């Protein structure tokens, strides 16, 4: 497992030693790696990974950040409602693309979200991390926090639409693991083409015509 946070998300983690460890770190991006298997296998992978990252200027923080992430990885979603009640907009979205397109996509979606949210006069915090990695590419997971302005659902719809347009414009998938749902329906043709939509409609009509 590899999770790589961008500078903004890492900065949030730097605010507490419970997440980052005791070492004094002033910037950069936090990478968390976890391996499964026999003790010999996992130690070998950890040793190889540490060597690769160290050779490129990385600093090992030990096991504490990974253990903190494992312990609290499912806690963050429960903060959403509390933040909404406190007057903050908090939402997430995700996408995926090839390695060669990853940095361009990340910059485009970050800019789209930031512009859409700050245009209403509120500050916005847009965080991103790589959540899944593959031989050919990776998934980008964005977390957005901003002050509420008017109808919060409409505020997010505008930001989400801007992000989706950036995703489509940069030839990425409209969703990696959150699935399609009604939120992504407007971009289904961009995602799978006219033929793909026709196939889905034919299957629906045949198996579930009601």
Question: Across the structure, where does each feature detected by a protein language model lie?
Answer:
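C-terminal substrate-recognition/cap domain of FAD-linked oxidoreductases
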Residues: 1-162, 170
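Conserved acidic catalytic centers in enzymes
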Residues: 98, 178, 208
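Long, contiguous binding/interaction regions
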Residues: 110, 157, 165, 174, ...
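Generic secretory/membrane-interface signal
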Residues: 126, 171-172, 202, 208
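Short acidic/histidine-rich active-site segments
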Residues: 173-180
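Activity-critical C-terminal alpha-helical subdomain
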Residues: 181-210
């Amino acid at each position: 497992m590899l999770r790589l946070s961008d500078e903004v998300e890492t900065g949030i983690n730097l605010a507490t030693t419970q997440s980052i460890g005791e070492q004094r770190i002033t910037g950069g991006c936090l990478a968390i790696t976890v391996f499964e298997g026999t003790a010999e296998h996992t130690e070998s992978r950890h040793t190889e990974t540490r060597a690769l990252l160290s050779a490129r200027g990385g600093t090992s923080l030990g096991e504490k950040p990974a253990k903190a992430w494992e312990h609290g990885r499912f806690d963050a979603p429960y903060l959403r409602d509390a933040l909404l009640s406190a007057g903050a907009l908090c939402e997430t979205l995700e996408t995926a693309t090839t390695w060669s397109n990853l940095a361009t996509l990340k910059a485009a979606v970050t800019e789209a979200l930031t512009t859409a949210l700050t245009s209403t006069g509120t500050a916005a915090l847009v965080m991103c991390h790589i959540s899944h990695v593959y031989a050919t590419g990776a998934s980008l997971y964005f977390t957005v926090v901003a002050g509420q302005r008017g109808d919060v659902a409409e505020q997010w719809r505008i930001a989400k639409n801007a992000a989706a347009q950036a995703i489509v414009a940069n030839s990425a998938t409209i969703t990696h693991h959150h699935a399609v749902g009604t939120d992504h329906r407007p971009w289904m043709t961009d995602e799978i083409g006219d033929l793909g939509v026709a196939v889905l409609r034919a299957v629906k009509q045949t198996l579930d015509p009601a």
